[in-house]
Amino acid sequence: MTRAIITGAAGFIGSHLSEKLLAEGYTIVGIDNFDPWYEPKIKQQNIESPLKHKNFSLIEADIRSFDFLSLFKKNDTVFHLAARPGVQDSWGQGFLNSVENNIYGTQRIFEAALHAGVRRVTFASSSSIYGSSATGPERKVNPISPYGVSKAACEQLAEVYRERGLDLVPLRYFTVYGPRQRPDMAMNRLFRAALPGSFRFPLRGNGNQRREFTFVEDIVDATVRAGYTLKSPSLEAFDIGGGVSASLAEVMALVEQITEASIRVDQYPVADGDPLITVASTEQASKLLGWKANTSLQDGLQQHYESFSE
């Protein structure tokens, strides 16, 4: 039976990936440090279902210090999702967390995977690496936030380890939403601001910022395909996006339609490091992974809302 490692297994995307692979018959070892950056009990709830499965085991460990080598020797595929997320939290002293978790932690995983003879490492990069050049065929990696810099550095590390023979696949996720989304992320905040209570959505700018929102199940589908369907070795980095770019104002209108309520808003200036628009180029993902997003924004928001209001 195929065995795989998932770092960040109790997180938003990692818990969905764990469930997907278990349902397909894989044996999974999940790694998570339950960082109190947000409430650990949320992650504990995320991972409840996998923990009940006979083919799942969980190691509570930190990627900055855990000895991966012996574990990796027993597994053929690694899905590396563990990271310190968040553009705004990466400014100032917060960048140290980005460096330690995203860059150093990733380098340790690549190093161990190389020496353990792992077949492939598929890892989560981000649309943040594009910065303001996030559209058009000539766009370049040009991050405008410390978080984006940390993710771009991970991709550069991937190039270095590819030269040494490690098969690595970076996936540039575009604005992921859906059930179990982190509490600091926009969709959760929008629904909180529409449902009864006192929470108000912190709207930065006028809502004209456009994002390519991607439903978590589509993200997981692409991730599994990158891990197992893609021919080896891979020399690609793939944009993984939902197919349609929508403005925040348009999303707010959809949330109000779904909840039949008005969103409470406090308005602030545009945040540093926040690009005006992100648009994915998914042609390579379609060609080499056989992947495309299947969830419309309307349907994805409905599923997000139903899980949020449970």
Question: Where are the regions that the model predicts?
Answer:
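Residue-level recognition of beta-strand->loop/alpha-helix junctions
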Residues: 172-175, 267-269
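Conserved active-site region of classical short-chain dehydrogenase/reductase
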Residues: 103-111, 184, 217-220, 224
